[in-house]
């Protein structure tokens, strides 16, 4: 499990990376099964494609 932002950034500091988020943790026992794509470019700045604000507010994501 990776925290959004904290552990994704180091992979993107020197090069562009595409990360597939498989599962977003939602509330107690309910999970939203969705595939998201994050494109990260340079210095920890990310460009995000296909992710809603609601998904970004979740605490953890699983990266495949």
Q: Where do the model's predicted regions map?
A:
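Short beta-strand-centered aromatic/proline hotspots
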Residues: 16-27
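Intrinsically disordered, low-complexity, charged/polar segments
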Residues: 37-64
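Short, solvent-exposed secondary-structure boundary/capping segments
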Residues: 29-38
